[in-house]
Amino acid sequence: MGKRLGALTKDNTKCMIKVNGVTLIDRLLIQLSSLQLSRVVIVVGYKGDKLREYIGNRYPDLHIQYVYNTVYNKTNNIYSLYLAKEYFVEDDTLLIESDLIFDDALFHKIVDNSYPNLALVAKYETWMDGTMVRLDEDD
């Protein structure tokens, strides 16, 4: 359903796009594998069964659970987050969008951080659209 990516997402989800020969979801799951997490919860919608089949048993060191957003074409990321809410009250949570690329060291910095809550945001650029965060001197 990634409309802006056109043909690249006609038959796949955005996270299955390859960058430098590696799908975004593979890159992310490899990074998460190094963190020794108790579980990874993936909310799937568009082409969700195809993504689940693709991931299969590739990551035996990750306990992967899936939540299905059956109304993905009418909802957004917030609704997907709502669908997975039961998992967030059980454990510490890393909320990650699977169509983004992160430096490997970033995840270790987050997990090893002493703050009880932490949000990472990109510096605003004029080309950006979507949700924005404004910080003041207290943040």
Named regions from a protein language model:
Residues 9-10, 30, 53-56, 106-109:
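Short amphipathic alpha-helical segments
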Residues 10-27:
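Short catalytic helix/loop segments, enriched in acidic residues and glycine
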Residues 1-10:
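N-terminal nucleotide-binding beta1-loop-alpha1 segment
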Residues 44, 97, 121:
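Short beta-strand/turn micro-motifs composed of small residues
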